[in-house]
Amino acid sequence: MRLTDITDTKQLSVKINLPYQTNIDKNTMANPTTKQELLTAIADGYAKLNEQIDKMSAEEIAAPFTFTADPKKCGVRWQNDRCLRDLLTHLYEWQVLMEIFVMNIREGHPKDYLPDEYRKNYHEMDRMLVEKHRNTTLEEAKELLAQSHQTMHDLAGSFSEEELFTKGYFKCTYTTTMAAYFLSVTASPYLQAVKLLKTHQKNTQVRDKRC
């Protein structure tokens, strides 16, 4: 089953913002300027996320997030995530939307990245994406993200250098690049997620000490 088979494809053709910032933390890796660098950034970001998850204890994985109560600490995009499963399925759903975005371009009817019902209310959109997976297990969430991550890597690799890095090459990307869209649903949020999980670890350890 393709990822696009399980997601509503209704879109609205108006200018939208990218889901996440696209600038990579320069202390971690440089912003990609070639296709190979983009693919490396996507792969490395995913590897770092999995490395961070592997470092977490069972107690830390089971503990609910506390940092999401303060948007200044986690950013509005992560406010509705209450646990690791939420974070992973959130990433997965953003990548599903990206696959739909690319498929629409290739099928000759390009549309904007976000569906109509999501574009006008990001917070409600993120809440809906999290609620959609209330019955998804953590292991299922990991598998879903593994599949969508591979899809993102393969799709990014299928574009030419010109298609990826020319601003406005596709009208539906407006004044930005296709590479920026791929970064905004892969490497950038992967690295943001790593930072959030490290914060969660510290918070959990502090709570344990207080107990």
Segments predicted by a language model, with ranges:
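Short, contiguous alpha-helical
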Residues: 68-124, 153, 163-211
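Short secondary-structure junction/hinge motifs that connect adjacent elements
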Residues: 55-74
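A short small-residue
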Residues: 27-30, 72-74, 125-133
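Extreme N-terminal tail/first-helix region
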Residues: 27-54
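Acidic/histidine-rich alpha-helical segments that form the ligand environment
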Residues: 120-165
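A non-catalytic, amphipathic alpha-helix used as a structural packing/dimerization or gating element
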Residues: 40-48, 143-151, 188
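Short, Lys/Arg-enriched N-terminal segments with co-localized hydrophobic residues
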Residues: 11-28
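N-terminal amphipathic/hydrophobic targeting modules at extreme N-termini
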Residues: 3-8, 13
